[in-house]
């Protein structure tokens, strides 16, 4: 049962606004104490009303919580952001690069809202107040034991189907990077941190992760 329906059933005599406020409070409390209900279909309004600081993604009505990243995860993400931003700036490019919190409405609608570790958008018409609406050009995920299955499975499929041009999966544990260039249909390429990794979206950019982490 939808949480709003549940609260309204319990408070039939309340004013509509008061009942809606009670429903929102109940929703936040349930999420904080119990986590998302696997049997419930969550809406974009539910997603936007998540308690402040609670990071999650929305895929076809299902909420997926995101764990707090490790220190190394943050270092890699930050250094990638610096490297890409500096490259774009040095070339006078129009592409934009973002790190979380930054929502990607990967299908262009409200059904799938993801939060990649690094997002590069070259078509500025896709950028809005709420994030990116449509497929970014380049996405990077810094994987962890808790996210690896989704990064290599669900997200890989969603990014490819949406039209993302390039997708990197960085594994800090074994210091490797998997690169997918969906735009050309090439097979995945595998790199170690101490190798110079070429970027498809920016052909004159190469990144050696061992230089920064």
Give the label of every model feature segment.
Residues 1-213:
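Gly/Pro/Ser/Thr-rich low-complexity, intrinsically disordered segments predominantly at protein N-termini
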């Amino acid at each position: 049962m939808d949480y709003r329906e549940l609260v309204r059933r319990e408070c039939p005599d309340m004013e509509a606004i008061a009942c809606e406020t009670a429903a929102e409070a109940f929703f936040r409390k349930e999420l904080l104490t119990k986590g998302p209900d696997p049997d419930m279909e969550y809406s974009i309004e539910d997603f936007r009303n998540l308690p402040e600081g609670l990071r999650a993604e929305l895929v076809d009505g299902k909420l997926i919580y995101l764990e707090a990243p490790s220190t190394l995860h943050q270092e890699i993400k930050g250094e990638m952001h610096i490297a890409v931003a500096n490259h774009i700036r040095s070339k006078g490019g129009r592409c934009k690069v973002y790190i979380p919190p930054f929502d990607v409405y990967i299908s262009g609608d409200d059904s799938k809202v993801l939060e990649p570790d690094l997002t590069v958008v070259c078509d500025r018409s896709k950028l809005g107040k709420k994030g990116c609406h449509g497929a970014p050009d380049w996405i990077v995920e810094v994987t962890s034991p808790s996210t690896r299955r989704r990064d290599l499975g669900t997200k890989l499929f969603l990014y490819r189907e949406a039209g993302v041009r390039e997708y990197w999966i960085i594994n800090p544990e074994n210091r490797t990077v998997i690169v997918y260039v969906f735009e050309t249909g090439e097979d995945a390429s595998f790199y170690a941190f101490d190798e110079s990794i070429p970027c498809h979206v920016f052909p004159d950019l190469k990144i050696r992760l061992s230089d920064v982490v």
